[in-house]
Amino acid sequence: EALWESMGKDSTDLDDLIENVAIATVGDVMDLEDENRIFVKEGLQMLKRTKNPGLKALIECTGIDKESLNSYHIGFVLGPCINASGRLDTAKRALKLLRVRTQKEADILAGDLKALNDSRKDMTEEAVKLAKEQVETTDLSDDRVLVIYLPDCHESLAGIVAGRIRECYYKPVFVLTDAEDGAKGSGRSIDGYHMYEELNKCKDILTKFGGHRLAAGLSLEKENIAEFRRRLNENCTLTEEEMKEKVTIDMEMPFLCVTEELVKELELLEPFGKGNTKPIFAARGVTLLGARILGKNRNVLKIKAQDANGSVIEAM
């Protein structure tokens, strides 16, 4: 506020920036606690009626219903479109969208960013496919720490691919790609494996590295990739139990309690995100009564189940 006033501007105009604060907070995966949660909650309301031509165009071209816009749409729809320009081209394109004055130009720029993000998604899917093939058709499958070399993968996608592979196998993952000088890449970890500390043990064969417990970035000479993989696995102390993914539930709930009224009440806890995750409920003694695969892409599962109390529910 002081900075704004020192620029000779009215501090009340700061309210107009709350929608940008919401996008930045969710897009950068900040904890949705305390002031952050308030900023995002208010920013989402502003986004629904935004006057910014660029944001308005991006919301429309991605097919988001303004009235149902929430933190998910920032994190998984709008945010990736804005970030795609920096990943594959130049971040100036996203900045230009946010500063554009005319709706006509905004529509063109928003369409370009969406197309760029669609391209990014296709490239990511191809890289994930190649990474899985490496893991499942080579001796990588025996490793507790996966070091995957994808020479043709765009370096800005290495972290995304590493995260996807970690989800598949629940192992620490490093994805390396070709760089101008050697190889570089990103790592994504699991609980129980401090990625930065493990990299520190290999620092003599790394050109540079940085990170924290759950994620890291690094570069090294290509001829050191095999040695890097060997050392990481030799040093790894993860047990079989630590390599089993754990799901923490908030409470057990019988099917009888799952009502539209409950869903409405849970909406009061929004916005959801890091630091304020969606509650997870579970039921024990569930019997599956039937299941069907639906959808054009055969990627939707519909089930019918019965809990221990005899209540029957359908779910997608």
What does each of the following model-derived ranges do?
Residues 103-111, 115-149, 201-316:
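Mid-to-C-terminal polyanion-binding domains and interfaces
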